[in-house]
């Protein structure tokens, strides 16, 4: 599920450990979402669903037999994750539990942190409060701005999100056997 440019989505689709055929659907919630072009480029079915219509999302996910939901730059809080038909994971630009919610990068800079990073975690009822699956650290350089640090964190996300997805897929396979 995406809200923005779709770079994390495309990174998942093109990653060597990813079987593109396993990416069955991309749901987006902004009509001018850049991820739409990326989904079309890779032949991934995509569908607009308002973030206010979680019932429609659930209906689509069930119809497409989705086994894992990945929030790749989906900038809306899932109100009732327990109602979804499968696990949901999210990538967040901080080393959780620090700096939950919006403005995590700005908070890390303002608090003069030396290191920040990103976390992939399960989504639960608490905002950015689910079990952490994987984290990656990014040093904060003295010259870093919100923009430069955000880009550095995104590069780290590109490395850890596919690894976290593979980890979760293996867990799901073990549970099924």
Across the structure, where does each feature detected by a protein language model lie?
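One-carbon transfer enzymes
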Residues: 1-177
